[in-house]
Amino acid sequence: MKLFTSTLTAKKSSTHKPLISLALSVLISTLLISETAQAADANDRLEQEVDKQAKQLMAQYQIPGMAFGIIVDGKSHFYNYGLADKQRNQPVSEDTIFELGSVSKTFAATLASYSELNGTLSLDDTADKYIPYLKNSAIGNTKLISLVTYSAGGYHYRCLKTLENNKELLQYYKSWHPDFPVNSKRLYSNASIGLFGYISALSMHSDYTKLIENTVLPSLKMTNTFVDVPANKMEDYAFGYNAAGEPIRVNPGMLDAEAYGIKSTSADMTRFMAANMGLVTVDSQMQQALDNNRKGYYRTKSFTQGLAWEMYPLPTTLQQLVEGNSTETILQPQPIQLNEPPTPVLNDVWVNKTGATNGFGAYIAYMPAKKTGMFILANKNYPNTERVKAAYTILDSVMNN
């Protein structure tokens, strides 16, 4: 009986093994097909929504060309539209160089964070430590952290436009007096973070442009990003277009490199976005510098202020993002509540920054916790709120389906 039972068991086992293997194979194949189909559907939805938003924006604001770099769950996608140069009929590509405008400020913050990690700078230092000429002045007594977070007491947004040389620049800072107490309000300003970037370079005993182009960008492997576009890359440098449709590029100005002077491509800026989310390998100290930029120093009614970045706790709403990127928020003083001490590095947030020159408009937004974000480049300046709406709609189309 034992042998018979054993024989029956063996036969039963040999009968079921192929059936189980077949069932598993069918199940795995079905899951793979389903996953592939879902990924294809998601890619289709993404492309359709980007197409829709790009066509609407280009038609409404007469934008000649746009480039989108998008990361969804760690995977990069690129979409290009229109012309980089209307006269030459040159199409936009991932290698087209656009002006970033104030998105450049995120590189100034990165250099400073890197300098702090090297021990050459502290955000609690005052400006006069690096520029002795500013001793016994309001700005000289101001901490660097207040400069980079626009909370020093009120620099007007475009005050640098009237200055023509370093002598006039230092005289302006020396004679400046705050409009309101330090750390009481936020007033966005090129003069504030521009000086901060300038001091960051002084702390490392070098020139700002050289440090960005020879230290920061190579560390991030951003090979087509520049302060000064070299001669052999001018063919890839798009023309911007003003309200009259005339081709223009950014003019030199005081502290332009620090505040608004960097040019880049959608491929490079998507890599920059990926590095900020820890999705690509970069030098460990540079990675820590990128992460440290997302500490929260104070709160406005709309967002938490990091180093150059504005951060919105998830889940956020389109209304919050539009409010935080509105003209009023940029140009008018906003009451703040200090975080003492600053928050740890924030990941479960919508991180963003707008940027523009007279002929270009840019927007970057990413969510480290979701490994998702996007960059929009255009060779015409158009409203910040429209960039925000487009980005939110595009990312929502793939994340909530």
From Swiss-Prot:
What's one GO BP annotation on this UniProt entry? response to antibiotic
Tell where it localizes.
Answer: Secreted
Quote the InterPro entries the UniProt record gives.
Bact_CellWall_Synth/Modif, Beta-lactam-related, Beta-lactam/transpept-like, Beta-lactam_class-C_AS
Q: What class of enzyme is it?
A: hydrolase
Give a yes or no for keyword Signal in this entry.
Answer: yes
Where is it mostly found?
secreted
Positions of the catalytic residues = S102 (acyl-ester intermediate), Y188 (proton acceptor)
Q: From which residue to which does the signal peptide run?
A: 1-39
A molecular function annotated in GO for this UniProt entry is:
beta-lactamase activity
The superkingdom of the source organism is: Bacteria
Which PANTHER family has this protein been placed in? BETA-LACTAMASE-RELATED, D-ALANYL-D-ALANINE-CARBOXYPEPTIDASE/ENDOPEPTIDASE AMPH
What the entry lists under NCBIfam families is as follows: bla_class_C
Reproduce the miscellaneous comment text: The class C beta-lactamase family has a specific amino-acid numbering system known as SANC, for structural alignment-based numbering of class C beta-lactamases, or else the simpler name structural position. A multiple sequence alignment was used to derive a consensus sequence and then the consensus was numbered taking into account insertions and deletions. This allows use of identical numbers, e.g. for active site residues, despite differences in protein length.
By what name is this protein known? Beta-lactamase
Organism from which the protein derives? Psychrobacter immobilis
